[in-house]
Amino acid sequence: MGDFVVYRNLAPIDPRLPTLDEINKAQDKQLDAIPRKTSPDYAEILAFLLRDARTQDAPGTQIERVLFMGDTRMNDGTAFANICSAGNWSGIAFIGSEREDPLHTEIIEQNNTTLFLANRWNALDVFIEYCHQKDFHIDEHTVVLLDIDKTTLGARGRNDHVIDQVRVEAATQTVSNLLGGEFDIERFQHAYHYLNQTEFHPFTADNQDYLVYICLILGSGLIDLETLIDDVRSARVVSFSQFITQVDKKTSQLPPELRSIHEDIYSRFKQGDPTPFKAFRYNEYLASAAHMGHLGVDTPVRELLSQEILITHEVHQAALAWRAQGALLFGLSDKPDEASIPTGEMASRGNKPIHQIETEIVGAIS
């Protein structure tokens, strides 16, 4: 797919593709915020990008079909359906996740789209045969959308735990750097994992930037975890906005460096930035890159699966075949750009965007 890739900010890596501002102007839209993956606005922007990308490498060729590769029925399935609707295209999606129970597939048809759900990544062979049976042609009129996180890289149920571990590593490193000698790793990890539960998603908005910031404030001693949990459960604190506003009223009690970090995060939050904790996300990028391609080809597969973010063999092989048949490959990621693309300084040291980093290709193991 080269650089036909967009991360959360919908800023194409390939400079030939239009920017989000250019797309909004062409569509006569004024969006207050960058749309998320499951929104109809996201789908309309992506449909515009896909048509432009197809024109770049195959002038005069029209997109007629979408083949989507993902790992979550709700998020990826919704995004897929919206994209097909926005482009007025038919489509079929493979939604995979490795599980220990016996092989099972499920087919859900709705309007001009089909979801093919499987509990094995190697069920892609069954999916490809299903496409043949349904006369779903994969050719120059087809766009193959490759979800990057936990599909193309770090296959869900097989290797995705490394992506999660890397995020925790980055959060730990960030908070440790800021708290210095006051940092208590056990206390931090207890707070992080406790508040990362579904019960607290209405409070944290299931946003990792918010969660890591909350853990930073807890680590500073400004607020203790037990009090916060009680406040959330009793609805005295119902949102992250309420929490950070309360912290802002107590900044005089924070050390100067933490006060500066708080002010930066609070300012970005008020401006509507969904990833306001930049230091954390930059560390997440560096930690991710450090877990790609560093062990070597002679490393036992199980060790690779436990320590590296790997390319999913089945997805890789299928994508190569589809590209050879003329399909357009386009990568999607809902991961923040700051956690996926190096800063200028990082790039000057040889760092590359996540999708360009070489790492091992691993499939199912017996």
PLM segments and residue spans:
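A short, acidic, amphipathic alpha-helical segment used as a generic capping/interface helix at domain edges
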Residues: 41-59, 315-317
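Alpha-helical substrate-recognition element adjacent to the catalytic core
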Residues: 1-36, 96-98, 106-113, 135-365
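Glycine-rich anion-binding loop/nest that anchors nucleotide
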Residues: 49-53, 64-76, 331-333
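Acidic, divalent-metal-coordinating active-site segment for phosphoryl/phosphodiester hydrolysis
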Residues: 68-86, 316, 338-344
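Glycine-rich phosphate-binding active-site loops on the catalytic face of alpha/beta enzymes
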Residues: 89-103
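Nucleo/cytoplasmic regulatory scaffolds in medium-to-very-large eukaryotic proteins
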Residues: 62, 84-85, 108-118
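Short, basic/aromatic recognition patches
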Residues: 112-138
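Hydrophobic anchor at the start of a short beta-strand
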Residues: 66, 91-94, 329-330
